[in-house]
Amino acid sequence: MKIAVLAHLKHPIRKPFMGGLEAFTYEVTKLLLQRGHEVTLFASEHSDPSLNVHAILSDVDYDMETLSRFRSHELSEDFISTHHAYLELMQEIDQYDFDVIFNNSLNYVPITMATLAETPMVTVLHTPPIFEMKKAIMAANRYNKMTYVSVSQTNASMWEPYIPNCKVIHNGIDLNKWSYIANNSGEYALWFGRIHPDKGTHFAIAAAKLAGRPIKIAGSVADKHYFETFVKPLLDENAEWVEHCTHEQLNELIGNAAVSVITPCWEEPFGLVVAESLACGTPVAGFARGALPKIVTKETGCLTASCSVTELANCINDAAQLSRKACRVHAESSLDIQHMVSSYENIFAQVIKKCADKYVL
């Protein structure tokens, strides 16, 4: 198949990944290429060139040290630049003669313009409903041309008022990149990811201390005020922050932990950290929010619906007793990126056939 992959433009699609969406776009594009498809990734210019990138936005204002774009005093500058990048692409997308457009942009323009394009589009819903996307989808629904896929059943339920019976394909990870460690060497808890209020890092530290376990925090600071105010004061000899680590080092940190602590403070649509932890054999303790209750089973973790630090502390010690083998088996059966990509290939084939059938007399 000849596939156009539309990335979002907040960050280049390259390592180190700023978040799960960048990782998803990178991995799925790479696998589609490896499977022999003719793939073009439409992304910002500093994205990984091995992904056959067609740059639609300059990264002259992107700081590779802070992994962020320089902010103009004109609050609309980023918005307008992104709007026109997608607008110009969608105006000429049919000229490329793609079989299908795989839309991961989290932007309203491709959805709006897809109603005027001949090339069929599959849009992935990576987040709960946001204003711009809702408005575009409601308008596009009149044309019945779009195919939507949600990354979890929980996320699909939130989109139900706008997209009834949305298809669901769970996100997956490359299990070959995450080594299973059957016998962990540490009794510490681990929290890893972006340090941001949405991720609730300080709750994990407080709960681990209450549980009597040391905790390691691995991740970059995505919100400096939050880090300085809520996280840094809790760091001590029993709460260590590992700011920078390679993929191999992160694998070791996860695999040797007794338990991973995952504390979403919003309705997390999926949470790749869950899959990564289970792939390494490390059970999960966390808040029962967003997609976590649909991903974490009683054999692989312990969740608290109350989101209290006291109950999370109990979950930490309970989860640490669970079978590490069961965690890896669950990752292999339900969270493998190979299964995920195959499911998307099936969707693409259906959409392409449906589009072709319209033109059969």
Q: Model-found features: residue ranges?
A:
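Catalytic cores of nucleotide-sugar-dependent glycosyltransferases that transfer UDP/GDP/TDP-activated
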Residues: 1-361
